Regions:
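Glycine-rich segments within core transmembrane alpha-helices of 12-TM secondary carriers
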Residues: 143-183, 433-445
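12-transmembrane solute porter fold
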Residues: 17-31, 38-39, 289-449
Length: 450
């Protein structure tokens, strides 16, 4: 990798602790800003006269945008222009947030959500790589550069141990920050109106742009050639169309009476045609956008299956929201406050995962423990509902489920990427997000809602 200025990406007058705080602060809008906010869903539905499926579909569109970015991960990491990418990314997110706050078009809302999901992943990865370089003095891209794989079995074992410790810490940080963002949006909706969530986030984006202007100097490209082939954005578009059609069918199927509705029929045809076209293009290209060879790896297939089971099971968390919302008459703010207990579960699960992984506990026992926690949470809910349920006791299934979620969330990628060549990493992350955030949740929601 090329050399960077001593205090990259900041001016030399910026103290290192302040720079670290700034980079951490940037994660708040990156992880929180979106086309829709679940915590303000009820108020948004009543304000716009829309149904809950519209909110779900927009949320899935955000996840599709995030997955569509992943094959560009390594090439984006090579650009390394924090100031340019933060200003451009935050500015575009500001524009899309403004459109989402003003529009009553579901199509426009979903389209902006998709773009914002793509931008979220761009900014998240750029900021994460920069933070690791700035605070940890480590070049993260070296750990994902094809050709830098360990050459011996001991080297791979050491890498697996490092991942077992690092990935739970990273997941813990992102999941806790995401929950804090949910609580913030719920509070804003409760105290003001749902539109004010967008306006607050727009103000936060402007603040981040201002801080970027003041604290970061201009940096030239570190390579002669721009690393991203813009032709592959066409492939990414077909990928997005395929997943959007699938999620449309699964989200609106019950409301529109499935295949009695022509839009469901056309969406199915669109998913099949776009899916076949995407596979054909990727298989025949010399430098594909998505490498299907990643699915030939046994650990990747198991990771795919585990994530699918995990997210289908986790979709049952909707029963907690239904019970607290309808049965206990709680509003979104109280639900979000109750959801804050998940941070305790994340912390317990994260610490336990790191400790047990370093101790060398076999994956099968850790996976069994994770799914056991999910089962215990569902069992607790069953008996609690039978006993009419108390608000004070609803925190226990949330803590138990989030502990199991943290165990599985952080361990499945570690298991799936064992001995995996780095050239497949971007395609694996795309597969992981597609299953974890799009396909499995949409299928799970369709199953439970029917």
């Amino acid at each position: 990798m090329p050399a960077y200025p001593k205090n990259y990406p900041f001016y030399n007058w910026v103290p290192k602790p302040i720079g670290i705080i700034i980079l951490f602060m940037f994660f708040l809008p990156i992880l929180t800003v979106g086309g829709t906010y679940s915590a303000s869903g009820t108020e948004m539905m009543s304000g716009l006269g829309i149904i809950s499926e519209h909110i779900q579909f927009a949320n899935f569109a955000t996840s599709i945008g995030m997955a569509a970015f992943c094959p560009f991960l390594y090439r984006l990491g090579c650009i390394r222009r924090e100031k340019m990418m933060c200003i451009a990314g935050f500015s575009l997110m500001y524009i899309f947030s403004y459109i989402c706050a003003k529009t009553d078009s579901i199509f426009l809302l979903a389209l902006c959500s998709l773009f914002m999901g793509f931008l979220r992943m761009v900014l998240m990865m750029v900021n994460l790589f920069t933070l690791i370089k700035y605070a940890g003095h480590m070049e993260a891209t070296e750990k994902i550069t094809p050709g830098n794989e360990p050459l011996t079995g001991k080297g791979w074992d050491k890498l697996d141990i490092e991942r077992s410790a690092a990935q739970p810490a990273i997941y813990l940080f992102f999941m806790v920050l995401g929950q804090l963002g949910t609580s913030l949006t719920a509070w804003l909706t409760y105290e003001y109106e749902w539109q004010y969530v967008y306006y607050f986030m727009m103000g936060l984006l402007l603040l981040c742009i201002l801080i970027t202007f003041v604290t970061m100097p201009y940096h030239k490209y570190t390579t002669r050639r721009f690393p991203i082939n813009f032709k592959q954005f066409g492939n990414a578009s077909i990928f997005c169309i395929t997943l959007t059609c699938i999620t449309y069918v699964l989200t609106y199927g019950k409301v529109l009476d499935w295949y009695d509705d022509p839009t469901i029929q056309w969406a199915t045809v669109g998913a099949v045609v776009a899916g076949i076209l995407f596979v054909h293009i990727e298989v025949t290209l010399r430098n594909p956008y998505y490498q299907f060879d990643v699915l030939k790896l046994r650990t990747i297939r198991f990771g795919f299956l585990f994530y699918f089971l995990l997210m289908v099971l986790n979709s049952s968390s909707m029963f907690v929201n239904v019970f607290t919302g309808i049965g206990m008459k709680l509003d979104n703010y109280q639900n979000a406050t109750l959801g804050n207990w998940s941070m305790l579960g994340y912390f317990i699960g994260g610490i336990a995962t790191i400790w047990l992984s370093v101790k060398g506990v076999h994956f099968k026992y850790l996976f069994a423990a994770g799914f056991l926690f999910l089962g215990l949470s569902a069992m607790f809910m069953y008996f609690e509902v039978q006993g009419a349920g108390l608000y004070e006791r609803m925190k226990y299934p949330i803590i138990i489920r989030s502990t199991g979620m943290m165990l599985l969330y952080s361990l499945i990628p570690t298991f799936a990427t064992q001995r995996m060549p780095y050239k497949y990493l971007s395609s694996w992350i795309c597969t992981m997000l597609t299953v974890r955030m799009v396909l499995a949740p949409s299928i799970g929601t369709a199953l439970y809602s029917n």
